[in-house]
Swiss-Prot record:
HAMAP family: Glycogen_synth (MF_00484). Belongs to the glycosyltransferase 1 family. Bacterial/plant glycogen synthase subfamily. Pfam families: Glyco_transf_5 (PF08323), Glycos_transf_1 (PF00534). It comes from Clostridium perfringens (strain 13 / Type A). InterPro entries: Glyco_trans_1, GS/SS, Starch_synth_cat_dom. PANTHER family: ALPHA AMYLASE DOMAIN-CONTAINING PROTEIN, GRANULE-BOUND STARCH SYNTHASE 1, CHLOROPLASTIC/AMYLOPLASTIC. It is an enzyme of class 2 (transferase). Keywords: Glycogen biosynthesis, Glycosyltransferase, Transferase. It catalyses: [(1->4)-alpha-D-glucosyl](n) + ADP-alpha-D-glucose = [(1->4)-alpha-D-glucosyl](n+1) + ADP + H(+). One of its GO terms (biological process) is glycogen biosynthetic process. GO terms for molecular function: alpha-1,4-glucan glucosyltransferase (ADP-glucose donor) activity; alpha-1,4-glucan glucosyltransferase (UDP-glucose donor) activity. Gene3D superfamilies: Glycogen Phosphorylase B. Signal peptide: none annotated. This is Glycogen synthase.
Length: 482
């Protein structure tokens, strides 16, 4: 087509499903590029080649080339591997020194590891002779790519016309390090700290660099984009985000409808759809048997699939647990996190063995079965940039109870008993009594089977696929490269 330009986008990320993931970022990086590819964008992904990547995926990789990457005063080996998965090209950057570790994050040299990765991403482009129109960075781990590009690489004609975008998936994690990182790892003097563009409370911040130097800043929901411009949610970067508000936009995440599809999901006991909702209860019966809970199709099953942390509202749940368990309910928990919460939920199982199943682990198959079996899904987060759990719950007909924050506010529409419209229940104040009140309202509604069926239909009919969101990303890219 005359005048048609294929937009080339490189997603730089520290994790991507199916190769490796620790949370929502990995899910997004596995699904969004695939959807953009369907919309005619040449979307590719670059990430570290961690030793934890599964063997069957490693077997798909082909070695392209190697080169040395300057990290301050020294040079480090970088190998480039490539594979195609779901029609998307992935580049994995190999460095045994930096990425052959037990975990992805939390190492003492994380600053150096991702300083290497960020420069290696830019160096790789010239080495493989592929120049994207846009480098789309994600969270602090790729935050120095826009900085390196603006201060250094844009002077090279090869890189000159590249635009940079950064998505903030969670502003809480910022990549804050000593200011000595600049000369030690990037070969710069202290000027970016002195002029304030990277300075953060006496040190330097990868995230602040990304916010200052990216051409566009995105968050993963419209409400979170507004929230992070306020002191309560802004994590000491709210002033800068207000200043750069003209470049800030929120686009809500979707979920991968290929992976989360109750009508085809091989991980659940009985497939069902919005047309065969009556089959959903067979999953509940199978899960009750699997977890050793009393088998009863009528008892409301309430679930939590989450990291067990304050951010996820676990303190509220702990406060109401005994009151909740006086009722005729079953509570199923899956997740790991804060040691105190893990112990508390294990203690609840000992205290209420016929009502509580506490699974302190991560198990993807069990997560699917819990979503498919649950009647109610709890997600009372203190803050939630987007949240994927509530979207998966909707897909499987588990009615979410959420706090109105971030992406939860954007995706869950509280049930109105007068109009009959809604796909979940919500509350505003971060208060355990308010949470208990809305759970009681949901349980009261559950007793009316006709209304509850209508709620399930509205939940399952909610469109939370990547289709709409990917269209908004495409529009942003088109506007950026005009």
């Amino acid at each position: 087509m005359e005048g048609f330009k294929l937009i080339k986008v490189l997603f730089a990320t520290s994790e991507a499903n199916p190769f490796i993931k620790t949370g929502g970022l990995g899910d997004v990086m596995g699904a969004l590029p695939k959807e953009l590819k369907r919309k005619g964008i040449d979307a590719r992904v670059i990430l570290p080649k961690y030793s934890a990547i599964k063997g069957e995926l490693l077997d798909k990789l082909s070695f392209k080339k190697w080169f040395m990457v300057p990290v301050g005063w020294r040079n480090q080996y970088c190998g480039v591997y490539q594979c195609e998965y779901d029609e998307v090209i992935y580049y994995l950057l190999d460095s045994e020194f930096y990425f052959h570790r037990n975990g992805l994050y939390g190492e003492g040299d994380d600053g150096e590891r991702f300083a290497f990765f960020d420069r290696a991403v830019l160096e790789t482009l010239k080495e493989i002779d592929w120049c994207p129109d846009i480098i789309h960075c994600n969270d602090w781990q790729t935050g120095m790519i826009p900085v390196l590009h603006k201060l250094e690489y844009s002077k090279d004609p090869f890189y000159k016309n590249i635009k940079t975008v950064t998505s903030i998936h969670n502003l809480l994690f910022q990549g804050n390090f000593s200011a000595d990182v600049l000369p030690e790892l990037f070969g710069y003097d202290y000027e970016p700290v002195r002029n304030g563009s990277l300075e953060f409370y006496g040190g330097m911040s990868f995230m602040k660099g990304a916010i200052n130097y990216s051409d566009r800043i995105l968050t993963v929901s419209e409400t979170y984009a507004k929230e992070i411009k306020t002191p309560y949610f802004g994590e000491n970067l709210d002033g800068l985000l207000r200043e750069r508000g003209y470049a800030l936009k929120g686009i809500v995440n979707g979920i991968d409808y290929d992976e989360f599809n109750p009508s085809k999901d091989s991980l659940i006991a009985k497939n069902f759809s919005v047309k065969t909702i009556e089959d959903k209860v067979l999953n509940k019966l199978a899960l009750q048997k699997e977890l050793g809970l009393p088998i009863n199709p009528d008892i409301p099953m309430i679930s939590i699939v989450s990291r067990l942390t304050n951010q996820k509202g676990c303190d509220l749940i702990v406060n109401i647990a005994n009151r909740l368990l006086q009722r005729n309910v079953q509570l199923v928990i899956l997740g790991t996190g804060d040691y105190n919460y893990e112990n508390h939920f294990k203690g609840l199982q000992e205290l209420y063995p016929t009502k509580v199943s506490a699974n302190i682990k991560f198990d993807n198959g069990l997560a699917h079965r819990i979503y498919a079996s649950s009647d109610i899904f709890l997600m009372p987060s203190l803050f939630e940039p987007c949240g994927l759990g509530q979207l998966i719950a909707l897909r499987y007909g588990a009615i979410p109870i959420v706090r109105e924050t971030g992406g939860l506010k954007d995706t869950i529409h509280s049930y109105n008993k007068y109009t009959g419209i809604g796909n979940g229940f919500s509350f505003t104040n971060y208060n355990h009594n308010d949470l208990m009140h809305v759970i009681e309202l949901a349980l009261e509604t559950y007793d009316d089977k006709e209304i509850w069926r209508s709620l399930i239909i509205q939940a399952m009919d909610s469109d939370n696929s990547w289709n709409k969101s990917a269209e908004k990303y495409k529009e942003l890219y088109e506007e950026l490269i005009k």
